[in-house]
Amino acid sequence: MKIGLIGFGKTGKSVASILLENNKFCLEWVLRQSTVLEHRSVPEFFGVQSDEPGLIYSSSKTSIEELLNKHPVDVIIDFSSNEGIYTYGEIAAERKVKIISAISHYKEKELQLLKKLANKTTVFWSPNITLGVNYLLFAAKFLKKIAPWVDIEVNEEHFKKKQGTSGTAVKIAEALDIDKNNINSVRAGGIVGKHEVIFGFPYQTVRLIHESISREAFGNGVVFVAENLENKQKGLYNFEDILTPYFTV
């Protein structure tokens, strides 16, 4: 499966390293805003031997259309920003290139665009693409269904410079139908990401906790999603769509 990666920040780099390790995927190229590292290869950047091209391009000098003409891919993985979808979405959808977006925050306008693109190709979006946190969300919804009256609080912890409430915490609150004021945020040091859902019963407490140890967790999530989207028809998918069949008895 040929992959194009949008975004090469800390998380993008971690995702790229995981893709290079998996022989089911071929990292064809990386597109980023900066001209730093332009025309170098990802394997060279990591100092590893690989047959995968993984060439790095700058969006200021190379258009997505030009890139897809020269190096067609099956899937585009987006770890850039909420604005990124405007640079490649329409072109990718026209060419039936699958889209996996791991952008934590989208405005309503971008969400509507994703729905529009899903009429032409397979689109997946999750504000947190790690497997573990989506297992947590799945289990939390199940518990809420059993005890809809239970008190629920959400705690989230991230690195010092992360601004605003995490998209994952917001999604958890929305999925459990609780007020966003029930989200408690901590910013300290280099915490990659930790989410805790507390269910307060009268005589007992249930805590569901997920903690990302390193950003490679996002890469493992990408691999899982890409494998499960391979035979999916056009449409807009989320993690619940992919996980539900695994829980069917």
How should these model regions be labeled?
Residues I6, F79-S80, A102, S126:
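Structural motif
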Residues E65-V75, F79-S101:
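Rossmann-fold NAD(P) dinucleotide-binding segment
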Residues F138, F142-V150:
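A charged, well-structured terminal subsegment
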